[in-house]
Each structure stands twice: as structure tokens, then as C-alpha cells.
């Protein structure tokens, strides 16, 4: 009888812990297991009816919470770098660089959500979980996202993520060859190339 009582208490405790572990906290916990990584990715953009309109590929480097380098290689090259204070966006085709303060950057974009992994950002979404897949629906109708989905393994490896905008356009990113570990600090530094136009919005 005593053993049965102990067993029941253990099972009850396990069930309580399961209930307390919300999808949102589970997602944050998984992402927190990997603080820095490098991966390549593919991108597919499609219209609301599923018609593909763009495919691309690139690489990204992340060091949470505020350092990242997102390098879109094709179809058109672009670079988005955060050095922890400034967010740099470089478009080689138009030879222009835009600089803004990172703390002014919106937290309602998929990449910012993943790299910052800030509880205040996740709190703006209703989060549901199905295995290793997490669906996030904004609580505010003013959000430019309609739905955000991310697949994260228990060890923190990100398989991919997708975003559906209010007009139904869907962007799907599949991550490949994620390598966890230290990232060269140079990846998070950016100096505008000579001759490009600098739109410095930090002065506004």
C-alpha cells in the first residue's frame, strides 16, 4: 500500500510538471539550449493559393541574444547584420546600407523572434505545440504576421520555420547543416563598403 501511494505521488508530480510546462516555455527552453550556431538555409515564397513566386538560399550565423548575420545569397544578395547595438541592412545591387538601432527593431518578425528568444516577444503570441512543431498566432490584429511556425528539436536544433502574412503569402525556410558552437566575432561586425550610400536612421 505504501509503495502504491509513493508511485501515485510520483505519477501525479510528473503530470503536474507536464501541465506546468507550457508550449511557450518549452519552445524558449529548447532555443536556449543552443546559444550560437551556423547553418545554411533555403527559402520558398508562395502566394495565398500556393503558387511559388520565389526560391532562394543563404547562410546565417547566430549568437544569442543580440548578434546575428543573415546572408541571402540568391536570387538577390542581401546582408542583415546585428552587432548588438546597430542593425545593418546591405543591398549590394542598389549599393545602399541602412543602419537602425537594434532596440528599435520589431520583435514580430520570424528571424528576430528566433534570435532574440525574448519572453516579452513570445508573450505576444498564442503558442500551441504538436511534437517538435510550434505554431504561434499573434494576439494583436495589428501584427503583420498571421501565423508563425517553427520546428525545433529537444536539443535546440532548428529544422526550419515559416511565416504566413496577413495577405496569405507564405515564406518557408528550411535549415540545413546546423553547426552548434562558437562563431567568429567578425561575423557580427559590419563596415559599409566604400562608395555605397548610407541611410543612417540612428540619427532620427
Swiss-Prot record:
Keyword Chaperone among UniProt keywords: yes
CDD domains linked: LolA
Alphabetic keyword roster: Chaperone, Periplasm, Protein transport, Signal, Transport
Protein's GO biological process: lipoprotein localization to outer membrane; lipoprotein transport
CC annotations in GO: outer membrane-bounded periplasmic space
Gene3D superfamilies documented for this protein: Lipoprotein localisation LolA/LolB/LppX (2.50.20.10)
Localization, UniProt: Periplasm
SUPFAM superfamilies, A to Z: Prokaryotic lipoproteins and lipoprotein localization factors
Top-level taxon: Bacteria
Pfam family, one: LolA
Signal peptide: 1-21
InterPro entries reported for this sequence: LolA/LolB/LppX, OM_lipoprot_carrier_LolA-like, OM_lipoprot_carrier_LolA_Pbac
Primary location group: periplasm
Family note: Belongs to the LolA family.
Role, per record: Participates in the translocation of lipoproteins from the inner membrane to the outer membrane. Only forms a complex with a lipoprotein if the residue after the N-terminal Cys is not an aspartate (The Asp acts as a targeting signal to indicate that the lipoprotein should stay in the inner membrane).
Quaternary structure, from the entry: Monomer.
Identification of the protein by name: Outer-membrane lipoprotein carrier protein
Source organism (scientific name): Edwardsiella ictaluri (strain 93-146)
Gene behind this protein: lolA
